[in-house]
């Protein structure tokens, strides 16, 4: 495979946050027990003028700022999400036009629960490595919803990150050493057409779903690359909550110094398709030349994509060309449960 890698990346988060205590108070629940059980303290909430398209556009523009490339040279735009604003009207077309790509671009909206963004990255890798195009963009983004009173309401959040994939060695911020996927038919989480909120299998979402796929993909990736956890400086996993993330990292043998920058859920919630792309963006913001990163996404239904990535010396040139993920995390305004219901359109007549 021709060498391909990341030439630009960018992230975006809404500024609004709601604390677990605020949600628990509305439902008469024990906030401390919930925070301890989920390892989530607060989550992001999109404003009334924000959706997956607006977040994707902001992230894509920041990725372009870091890349320094002409957007008209981008040959593909893929947006992975399970909360596209329209049932019939592609988010990818909105993003492509907003960042001024040429109309001569292939674009598509992707869905695979929370791993649609990493699936898009794999597609971009294939297109660039084949020589079909010089650059391709993948975005992972969501404005996730949970039914009022459901456990998901404490975690379902909003945010996303964009990645521009290229094959010119001198432009790479980080190169892909390899990728590996693991997929089965596992019904742990679903939502049918016309239903407002998803359903989930409760505890079934753990061992036979999340852990089976994440651990299998992780072990398969390391076997393919002939590596161990000691070969990596950082790691990031899908994070439906902080508890699952920490358990997966520790089961595989990663330590806190390796997994800390990728773990955003305690301060952000689960951004679904944006979770791993955002975690990776925060790692890149803190990386230096030669750092090796281990990445595993997860999407219910179910599947995982794994990546082995090495950071290049260009990283120091681009980090400050756009706002960092950590800066976005610090820009926050807390809202109460009533405002949250209003912003998320949960009051239905």
Curated annotation (Swiss-Prot):
Where (3S)-3-hydroxy-3-methylglutaryl-CoA binds, per the record, is at 30-31, 114, 155, 205, 238, 270, 300
State the EC number(s).
Answer: 2.3.3.10
Q: What is this protein called?
A: Hydroxymethylglutaryl-CoA synthase
Q: What does this protein do?
A: Catalyzes the condensation of acetyl-CoA with acetoacetyl-CoA to form 3-hydroxy-3-methylglutaryl-CoA (HMG-CoA). Functions in the mevalonate (MVA) pathway leading to isopentenyl diphosphate (IPP), a key precursor for the biosynthesis of isoprenoid compounds that are building blocks of archaeal membrane lipids.
Cysteine-cysteine disulfides: none
What's the short name of a Pfam family annotated to this entry? Answer: ACP_syn_III_C
Top class in the EC scheme: transferase
UniProt source species = Methanococcus vannielii (strain ATCC 35089 / DSM 1224 / JCM 13029 / OCM 148 / SB)
